């Protein structure tokens, strides 16, 4: 059996297996055990009581985190005319139509989020094989196909995160950086969980939010006591 590194031994001493930690204590622990030199993201995994094999139990959507993600987000918008001007005014990094599609086809994709107006989907639809595998394809269910491009751009820039259940019925999402104050991370987590609750499928039975776990990019998971989140 491989020997535990000094760092892993220290982490095991601080995190009690099987314990549910109050949210603020969990976030403080993440900061304490983080030893890498870059600003790690704080990630959350939420085990949902759904059957993701059934299409009516797939949970997907987006949340605007009140305290942002701590990341700089570059936004591309497929649109034209007055909407193009509105997108630029809202802070979009790249705005275009066929010219932007041509750049995407060349592999020039210096952006993290793609937004499109409905009339632009005839152009964006041709890029599905490029944007889809990268998780960049605009979708009305998460607010990235919209006539209100200004709000969509501001949301993307301001800390909007997207989520979708994986094959095991788990939502994975980043809710900030390890350097955030615990209260700020807690507010972000509460916003996400509130939207997940609203997105609960009517066909889901039993306990819906089964487990909430937080971790850093390179660290172990810490189970959160959900009762501490409303406090």
From Swiss-Prot:
CDD domains according to UniProt: Ribosomal_L1
GO biological process: regulation of translation; translation
Highest taxon, organism lineage: Bacteria
SUPFAM superfamilies linked: Ribosomal protein L1
Record InterPro entries: Ribosom_uL1_bac-type, Ribosomal_uL1, Ribosomal_uL1-like, Ribosomal_uL1/biogenesis, Ribosomal_uL1_3-a/b-sand, Ribosomal_uL1_CS
GO cellular component, one term: cytosolic large ribosomal subunit
Protein keywords: Repressor, Ribonucleoprotein, Ribosomal protein, RNA-binding, rRNA-binding, Translation regulation, tRNA-binding
One Pfam family linked to the record: Ribosomal_L1
One MF term in the entry's GO annotations: rRNA binding
PANTHER family recorded: 54S RIBOSOMAL PROTEIN L1, MITOCHONDRIAL, LARGE RIBOSOMAL SUBUNIT PROTEIN UL1M
Similarity section: Belongs to the universal ribosomal protein uL1 family.
Quaternary structure and partners: Part of the 50S ribosomal subunit.
NCBIfam families for this protein: rplA_bact (TIGR01169)
Stated role: Binds directly to 23S rRNA. The L1 stalk is quite mobile in the ribosome, and is involved in E site tRNA release. Protein L1 is also a translational repressor protein, it controls the translation of the L11 operon by binding to its mRNA.
Name under which the protein is recorded: Large ribosomal subunit protein uL1
Taxonomic source organism: Thioalkalivibrio sulfidiphilus (strain HL-EbGR7)
